[in-house]
Curated annotation (Swiss-Prot):
Top class in the EC scheme: transferase
GO cellular component, one term: chloroplast
Keyword Transferase set for record: yes
Cellular localization per UniProt: Plastid, Chloroplast
Membrane-traversing stretches: none
Domain remarks in the Swiss-Prot or TrEMBL record: The N-terminal domain is essential for RNAP assembly and basal transcription, whereas the C-terminal domain is involved in interaction with transcriptional regulators and with upstream promoter elements.
EC number: 2.7.7.6
Gene: rpoA
UniProt record similarity statement: Belongs to the RNA polymerase alpha chain family.
UniProt keyword annotations, A-Z: Chloroplast, DNA-directed RNA polymerase, Nucleotidyltransferase, Plastid, Transcription, Transferase
Primary role: DNA-dependent RNA polymerase catalyzes the transcription of DNA into RNA using the four ribonucleoside triphosphates as substrates.
Protein name in UniProt: DNA-directed RNA polymerase subunit alpha
Length: 337
């Protein structure tokens, strides 16, 4: 464990790691400070950073497992102590580290008797296991166990929709969140107008990356979110009789989608749900009512299509562009191969 005495700077804004430790292979802890900040800035940064740490950082998980000749998820296999469901739950807990894009295949092929652990997983070269001792199953008889696995890198929490299991393939709910928890606290010092703040940020990770790495990645993601505002062209907005009435330059969501089709990224668009964006409740409910659930659905609509929806206004179109931070959606997740 590393611990340093906190020293407050009164000059240039700076951050420092004041505590760092590894409680286990799958639990890392780090505490950081940022100072000096003006009154109110610590809370602004702390809230944004916590949300970025918990929701914007990508992780790698096992998302599907395929067994041979298994009728359903709650089946038992002769010679294996656990049911198929219990094995799936154990696979869900496996912590992986990778730099892959998209999905990869992996497998388990072992012969009993004996315990099956994470070290028995045959992985692609771009993926590694954080803790080889993680338990999967116990083979009580000399049988062969072969499981095909699918590995994905993504972010957030994905609940898999059950489909046809006749091929023995079972989806696994995936938690693509390498940061287990993040907290922030504020210490104020000084008097009157000279009052300043220190931001304390605590980060716990699952071992697939360190708290310091998580802090760097979350910071980069936050910066990427705001870059479009720095380079945005001056909007062609003007007020008419009603000061809240907004006229937008001509555009269509469909035109922008055409460019994405050229890069064959529609699958990624379908995995981004409008729930992930902070749309006003009225706008959100209106989109859901017309079966617009994902970014792909939304980008497939023109401005005219949206305006035909009941109770939908031109101000709502503008709000969608602002809330979705559309430039990040086009230039960040879909430009990598």
């Amino acid at each position: 464990m590393v611990r340093e005495k906190v020293r407050v700077s009164t000059r240039t804004l700076q951050w420092k790691c004041v505590e760092s430790r590894a409680d286990s292979k799958r639990l890392y802890y780090g505490r950081f400070i940022l100072s000096p900040l003006m009154k109110g800035q610590a809370d602004t940064i702390g809230i944004a950073m916590r949300r970025a740490l918990l929701g914007e950082i990508e992780g790698t998980c096992i998302t599907r497992a395929k067994f041979e000749k298994i009728p359903h998820e709650y089946s038992t296999i002769v010679g294996i102590q656990e049911s198929v469901h219990e094995i799936l739950m154990n696979l869900k807990e496996i912590v992986l580290r990778s730099n892959l894009y998209g999905t990869r295949n992996a497998s388990i092929c072992v012969k009993g008797p004996g315990c099956v652990t994470a070290q028995d997983i045959i992985l692609p070269t771009s993926v590694e296991i954080v803790d080889n001792t993680q338990y999967i199953a116990n083979l009580t008889e000399p049988i062969n166990l072969c499981i095909g696995l699918q590995i994905e890198r993504n972010r957030g929490y994905h609940i898999k929709t059950p489909k046809n299991f006749q091929d023995g393939s079972y989806p696994i709910d995936a938690v693509f969140m390498p940061v287990r928890n993040a907290n922030h606290s504020i210490h104020s010092y000084g008097n009157g107008n000279e009052k300043q703040e220190i931001l304390f940020l605590e980060i716990w990770t699952n071992g697939s990356l360190t708290p310091k790495e998580a802090l760097h990645e979350a910071s980069r993601n936050l910066i990427d979110l705001f870059i479009p505002f720095l380079h945005a062209e001056e909007e062609n907005l003007h007020l008419e009789n009603n000061q809240y009435k907004v006229t937008l330059p001509f555009f269509t969501f469909h035109d922008r989608l055409a460019k994405l089709r050229k890069t064959k990224k529609e699958i990624a668009l379908k995995s981004i749900f409008i729930d992930q964006f902070e749309l006003p409740p009225r706008t959100y409910n209106c989109l859901k009512r017309y079966n617009i659930h994902t970014l792909f659905d939304l980008l497939n609509k023109s401005q005219e299509d949206l305006m035909k929806m009941e109770y939908f206004r031109i101000e709502d179109v503008k709000q969608i562009l602002d809330s979705l931070e559309i430039e990040k959606a086009f230039h960040n997740p879909f430009t990598e191969e």
